[in-house]
Amino acid sequence: ASESELSQIEFPVDEDGNGEIKSIQLFGEDQISATGQSRGAKEFRFDFDKVFPPQASQQDVFEEVSQLVQSALDGYHVCVFAYGVTGSGKTFTMEGMSESVVGSPGSSSSSNPDMILGDGVEGVIPRTVQQIFHASKSLEDQGWEYTLSASFLEIYNETIRDLLAEPGTNLKYDIKHDREGHVSVSNIIQHEVSDPGQVHELLHRASRQRAWAATNCNAHSSRSHSVFQLFLNGRNKLSGKTSQGVLNLIDLAGSERLKKTQHTGDRKLETQHINKSLSCLGDVIAALANKSSHIPYRNSKLTHLLQDSLGGNSKTLMFVNISPNQEQLSESISSLRFAAKVNACEIGTARRKGGVDFNTSSK
C-alpha cells in the first residue's frame, strides 16, 4: 500500500512503553459545517490484543499464533479465522502467495517433503503445517506417535464442497453429529499425511478448485468460506495416553455491501449468502458470550460445521484484515466494530481431549 492510501490509518504505540502496537485509528474525510468551516476528520479508535502495521512480516503474524496452533498436539480444538472486507488480504494472511505456498506441480517444493519456500510470504496454514510436523517429531523422545490427516472444504452459497475430491464428483455433504455430539461431514475426504510436502500438494489442489470470481472490489475474489482441517491423533507408547486435537484454519469470504458493489444475478446471490453467514457467526459469538441457553449454530452451514471449535471447549482466534483503500473506509470501520465485539467476548475455558505431557498456552 502507498503512503497516500494509508494516510487515514494510524498505529499508536502502546503507552506502557514496551513498544507493542495494540490500537488502530482510522480517520474519515474532513467534516464541513453548514457555514462551510472545517470540523476536522472524524476519528475512530479500536483496541485489540495485537495490531500488525503494514511493515509486519508473515513471520511476525505467525509468531503471535504459533503456541496456539501447537496446542492442537496437546489435545485441543483450535480455530483460527481471517475476517474482513473483500480484497483486504485474508487469503494472503492464511495461505500466502498462491505459488509460494505450494509451488507449481513438479516444482522443488513438491518434490522435497520437508520444504516450504523461503521467500517469506508463506501464510499461517503452511507455517502451521511445518511447525506441527516439527513438534510432533520432537515428541517422539517422550513416547508420542501421531497420525495426522487433512481435509479441505469450502462453503459456497450454503453448500459444502470437498476441495480435495476429483472434479465432477457429485456427492452430498451433510453435517452430522456422532454419539458424543461431535460434528463431522459425510463423504468428506480425509487424507492421511506424513510430511509437509503432502499437505502442500493438497493445498495446491484445493486452491485450483475453490470458487473465485471478479467483483467490483477485487479482480480475484474468493466467493466462499474455505476450511482447512488438520486432525491430530496421538498415542504414547510408554504411558498408553491418547490425544485427539483438531485444527481449523479458516479463510472467510469477504463481506461486501450490496448497494456499493452493485452485484446482480449470481454475484448478488453469493454476496447475500456470504453476508448472512457472517452475521450468523456474529450471532453465535454473542450468544456464547452472553451465556445464552440457546446457541444458534444451525442458522448457517459455517457455524454448524464449526460448532465444536466455536464453543467454550476450544481455543479460538480471529484475524481482522483491513483494507488501506480510502473508498473502503466505511467497510473497514464495520469490520473493526465487529472485531471489537468479538474481542470483548469470553466464551469459556478450553478443555483438551486426552493428555500430552507438555503444555502450550494461547495468546
Enumerate the predicted regions with their spans.
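Short polar catalytic/cofactor-binding loops
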Residues: A1-S2
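Short, loop-centered acidic/histidine patches that primarily coordinate divalent metals
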Residues: E29, N321-I322
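P-loop NTPase motor catalytic core
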Residues: E15-S309, N313, S332
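Conserved GTP-binding G-domain of TRAFAC-class P-loop NTPases and closely related GTPase folds
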Residues: G181-S194, Q198, L202, G312-T316, ...
